[in-house]
């Protein structure tokens, strides 16, 4: 694909401006409902906000049948949300993203619930329970949302309690023994207060057999709930409080190995993709809770004073058979927990002035703890040390090695006994303070100038112990002055950043705006609290890293045409990242790997997004979106295999093109007092690389002939559909649904694990089922 540029938008803008002249007048009296968002922390029409935004409302959530945040990414241009395990959820926007692999490394996309930051990767994949809409903001959002939104932000807006007694019950059943039961009740307490409670319980069997244990991996077992309270305390003071929780516990699949543990040869125990042979079932357990208190006070001068207090806690436990084999060679057990307190104050001006503005103060504190073990299994000596010693690939440090017992060899080369651990323990305490301003000045009837800035300061204090004494030939380091007697690393760092933003909007007519926007953002620096090679740790390489920054430029159009029956939004962008933080598994040779985080690169992303919704008739709507992307390392010396120059390579997880196309058709059935609904969606993402090397195949770590397919995920197209019958009084609905109807079976992800194993993550197969809904 040739590099997209702002000129692409120019032709599109010209065509759209001409569209009203060519459109025939329509007097049918039906239009697409106006979309309202709070992307700038005040209620505005979507077309008036000079930011590239996608909105997924409650109807779209219900009709597509998506249940988790990660499912939304398929429908939104230039957005990827990982579908692997929830412990390391990754959101990528415009080619830029990162999972918070350890507690010292933050993500690049902020995920919020009603404006409150949910936290790091284990908390990201929220259930879409009782939501009004999902807003996806593309591009840096540093002015209003602050740190770690260099790629964008996602805000889940919940449906607030209202003054009517009503509720909803639904039951969903499908193949793979899928079952979901949901309930919602909204209860008026008096004329000034109301409450709501929503609950969802989801279960689904796995679809990847583990032939050693007899279990099926990649199952779902999730309980989600949300309680909300709204009080009109006085005519001027409104109180909104909420509590939400999510508990999940299931057998997961990190990857289906296509090589042995060290990538010396192909996988022998279960070579068929989609079947594994592990000695135990990997597991992912999450307990995520959040509380919010929102106080809104309408002042006599027309201003609004707002206080938003949030507290969120996440406990995540993750285990994996890291040898990917039916015997107990080595395994991992990770436990991370996060406690987050945030407080925000906002002063918001009236909406009808020439100058509208908002002042804000923000405080954020996160206490993160980690407890991670690599455990040498009971079969480690017999099935790892022994075979390598017998083949001559392990040589004890003796002048003329005699034939030694395997356990002696293991001890001589530095491994601990079976059951011993290589571990890291620690905590990171983050304190962040910010003050911000955002305003819009109406220059004339057609021109508006937007401007804002945020000043942030953030400190991180780390107390961390890495003990690699039992790691043998893998040479994991140990913290402290004496690696033979590890002691904690105690350190701190502070980042400060000024993030300005400016925009200019021109109203072409009453229904069409074009805008240009500049915005800056930053991702905070931190500490790489991971398994670092001993030599690199001693040299202080890849341990502490600096903040990264971004400057972004965007040109867009948002308009309504054909008398309000066609909405079209376009955006083109270019963003330049400096000191880009790269998190890599680095192969050091000889079976040694190090996990590095460095400010190693300069990155440029360019592209465009287009979204359209057309109300063809009163009963028929078409929707489409397109994303074009070119995300490359402008400069990344030493970023490839064996220190090769990765400059000019594409970023991982950045497909050149993504699109979605769908239609919704209603058929009235007056005799039944009901209506048929038919919805079909097609989603597509191009192939993309998974490493900075941009490889498509790699050699074995031995003389084994041939290569291993690794480094690129194939393009993927899915077809989803729903056929429903719903009563005209909205009392009941019965629907049949199907997802991935063509049974697309190409792997959806891949990885190279710490010891060298290359593994693929099989796609979710075709799923289908029936949903029953009762509203009261």
Mark where each language-model region is.
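Outer-membrane beta-barrel translocator/receptor signature
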Residues: 106-108, 120, 127-138, 143-210, ...
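Acidic, small-polar-rich N-terminal luminal/periplasmic segments of exported/outer-membrane proteins
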Residues: 28-164, 555
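Outer membrane beta-barrel strand-and-loop segments of large Gram-negative receptors
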Residues: 23, 332, 336-347, 393, ...
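Solvent-exposed loop segments that connect transmembrane elements
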Residues: 208-216, 253-277, 321-331, 373-423, ...
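C-terminal beta-signal and adjacent terminal beta-strands/loops
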Residues: 576, 683-700, 725-776
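Gram-negative outer-membrane beta-barrel transporters
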Residues: 357-358, 445-449, 571-576, 598-693, ...
């Amino acid at each position: 694909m040739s590099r997209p540029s702002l000129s692409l938008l120019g032709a599109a803008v010209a065509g759209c401006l001409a569209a009203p002249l060519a459109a025939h007048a329509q007097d049918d009296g039906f239009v697409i409902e106006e979309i309202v968002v709070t992307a700038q922390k005040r209620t505005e029409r979507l077309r008036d906000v000079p930011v590239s935004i996608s909105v997924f409302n409650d109807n779209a959530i219900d009709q597509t049948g998506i249940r988790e945040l990660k499912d939304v990414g398929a429908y939104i241009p230039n957005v990827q949300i990982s579908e692997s395990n929830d412990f390391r959820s990754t959101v990528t926007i415009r080619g830029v993203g990162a999972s918070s692999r350890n507690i010292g490394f933050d993500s690049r996309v902020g995920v919020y619930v009603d404006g409150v930051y949910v936290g790091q990767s284990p908390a990201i994949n929220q259930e879409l329970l009782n939501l009004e809409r999902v807003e996806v903001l593309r591009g840096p959002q540093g002015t209003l949302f602050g740190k770690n939104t260099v790629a964008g932000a996602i805000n889940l807006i919940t449906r607030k309690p209202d003054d009517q007694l009503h509720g909803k019950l639904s039951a969903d059943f499908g193949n793979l023994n899928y079952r979901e039961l949901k309930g919602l009740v909204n209860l008026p307490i008096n004329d000034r207060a109301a409450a709501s409670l929503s609950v969802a319980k989801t279960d689904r069997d796995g679809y990847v057999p583990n032939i050693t244990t007899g279990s099926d991996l990649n199952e779902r077992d999730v309980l989600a709930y949300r309680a909300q309270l709204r009080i009109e305390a006085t005519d001027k003071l409104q109180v909104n409080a909420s509590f939400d929780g999510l508990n999940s516990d299931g057998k997961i699949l990190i990857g289906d190995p296509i090589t042995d543990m060290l990538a010396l040869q192909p996988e022998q125990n279960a070579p068929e993709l989609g079947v594994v042979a592990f000695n135990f079932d990997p597991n992912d357990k999450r307990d995520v809770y959040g509380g919010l208190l929102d106080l809104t006070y309408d002042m006599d001068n027309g201003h609004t004073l707002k206080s938003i207090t949030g507290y969120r806690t996440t406990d995540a436990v993750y285990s994996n058979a890291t040898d990917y084999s039916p015997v107990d060679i080595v395994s991992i057990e990770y436990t991370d927990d996060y406690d987050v307190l945030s407080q925000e104050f906002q002063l918001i001006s009236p909406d009808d002035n020439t100058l509208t503005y908002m002042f804000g103060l923000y405080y954020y504190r996160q206490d993160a703890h980690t407890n991670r073990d690599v455990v040498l299994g009971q079969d480690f000596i017999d099935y790892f040390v022994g075979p390598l010693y017998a083949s001559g690939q392990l040589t004890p440090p003796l002048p003329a090695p005699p034939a030694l017992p395997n356990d002696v060899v293991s001890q001589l080369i530095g491994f601990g006994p079976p059951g011993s651990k290589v571990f890291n323990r620690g905590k990171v305490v983050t304190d962040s303070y910010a003050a911000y301003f955002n305003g819009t000045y109406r220059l004339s009837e057609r021109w508006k100038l937007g401007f804002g800035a945020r000043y942030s300061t953030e400190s991180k204090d780390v107390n961390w112990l890495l003990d690699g004494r039992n790691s043998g030939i893998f040479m994991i380091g140990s913290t402290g002055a004496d690696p033979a007697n590890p002691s904690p690393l105690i350190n701190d760092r502070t980042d400060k950043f000024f993030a300005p933003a400016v925009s200019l909007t021109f109203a072409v007519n009453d229904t069409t705006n074009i805008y240009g926007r500049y915005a800056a953002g930053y991702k905070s620096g931190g500490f790489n609290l991971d398994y670092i090679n001993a030599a690199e740790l001693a040299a202080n390489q890849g341990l502490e890293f600096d903040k990264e920054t971004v400057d972004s430029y965007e040109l867009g159009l948002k308009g309504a045409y054909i008398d309000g029956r066609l909405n079209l939004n376009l955006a083109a962008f270019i963003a330049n990242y400096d000191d880009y933080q790269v998190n890599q598994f680095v192969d050091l040779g000889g079976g040694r790997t190090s996990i590095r985080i460095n400010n190693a690169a300069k990155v440029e992303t360019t592209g465009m997004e287009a979204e359209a919704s057309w109300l063809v008739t009163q009963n028929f709507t078409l929707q489409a979106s397109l994303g074009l992307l070119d995300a490359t390392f402008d400069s990344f010396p030493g970023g490839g295999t064996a220190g090769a120059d990765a400059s000019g390579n594409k970023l991982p997880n950045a497909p050149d093109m993504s699109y979605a196309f769908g239609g919704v058709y209603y058929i009235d059935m007056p005799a039944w007092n009901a209506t048929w609904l038919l919805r079909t969606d097609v989603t597509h993402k191009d192939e993309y690389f998974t490493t900075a090397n941009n490889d498509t195949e790699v050699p074995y770590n031995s003389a084994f002939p041939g290569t291993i397919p690794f480094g690129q995920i194939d393009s993927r197209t899915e077809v989803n559909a729903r056929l429903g019958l719903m009563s005209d009084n909205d009392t009941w609905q019965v629907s049949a649904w199907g997802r991935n109807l063509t049974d697309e079976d190409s792997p959806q992800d891949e990885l190279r694990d710490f010891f060298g194993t290359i593994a693929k993550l099989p796609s979710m197969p075709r799923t289908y089922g029936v949903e029953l809904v009762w509203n009261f």
